[in-house]
Amino acid sequence: MRPTRYIDPHIHMISRTTDDYQRMAFAGCEAISEPAFWAGFDRGTAEGFRDYFRHLTLVEPKRAAQYGNRHYSWLCINAKEAENVGLSRDVIAMIPQFLASPACWASARSA
């Protein structure tokens, strides 16, 4: 019997191994939605966010695809980090360059 197919609406895969992608696919997961999150420390530069957003929109979709999963991401700056107004403005200004990525939820919704 084939498992029930499902979408995981909120999971942080950046901190997981590819074994988890494999297990999720075996269990019937077909798509993953990964929100950006606070890393446990405040990122100090917009470039740190750029690297993180690249990982969410380029690396994770490739890892997920190895097991037949689609990976989508939500890009944002966490409220805790947003206390630094200058950093917040820089991060928010860079987000549009990632919106065209097929792995970005905004792009997937407009298709």
Feature roles, as predicted:
Residues M1-A111:
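Mid-domain alpha/beta scaffold segments of enzyme catalytic cores
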